[in-house]
Amino acid sequence: MVHGWDGNPKNAWFPWLKKELEKNGFVVFTPLMPKPEEPKIDKWVNYLKEDVGVPDKDTYFVGHSIGCQTILRYLERVETPVGGCVFVAGFFNLPNLETEEEKEIAKPWLSLPIDFEKVKRCTNKIVAIFSDDDPDVPIEDKELFEKHLNAKTIVEHNKGHFSDDAGITELPSALNTLLDISK
């Protein structure tokens, strides 16, 4: 499970999902990504590579926000088949960044292309979960996940950015999706 920008593995619904997955027999890794307040593609992808080791068809990924981007960029580099991915508040656009610093940090994540064909060769089980009132991720990105990744998409209501600020401490849709795609 890969947390988001300025996040950590103890944020929001991460502890709950980890516990629920472990109850269902999953071995769950929730690394604290390097310098979460200033995520860099190469640092995060390389860190994930070290943490995961050699993935296989029984490896599943869950990402939140920029953690989704990290997983996509990881998969395009390793090109190894995995079980599937659940992306929560994943994005390709961030139109509401407020500061120049935020825009500078986000720029490479938004401008460097992802090889979607390589990602799709790794798995055909991709589910992306969005909220209809996310202040950061435009709901239109749902269509981009469907188009570029053949992702199944779920739209939750009133979940904001699925963060502590939105008060989201449990996320049954992520759990149920992961249990479903891992059958």
Predicted features by range, described:
Residues 1-57:
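Active-site catalytic motif of lipid deacylating hydrolases and related acyltransferases
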Residues 4, 33-36, 86-96:
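Active-site nucleophile loop of the alpha/beta-hydrolase fold
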Residues 60, 83-86:
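Residue in the alpha/beta-hydrolase core beta-strand immediately N-terminal to the catalytic nucleophile
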Residues 61-71:
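Gly/Ala-rich beta-loop-alpha elbow adjacent to hydrolase catalytic centers
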Residues 100-118:
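Active-site nucleophile elbow and catalytic-triad environment of alpha/beta-hydrolase enzymes
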Residues 122-123, 127-130, 134:
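Short beta-strand/loop motif that positions the catalytic acidic residue
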Residues 135-141:
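Conserved alpha/beta-hydrolase "acid-adjacent" motif
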Residues 151-183:
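C-terminal catalytic histidine-bearing segment of alpha/beta-hydrolase fold enzymes
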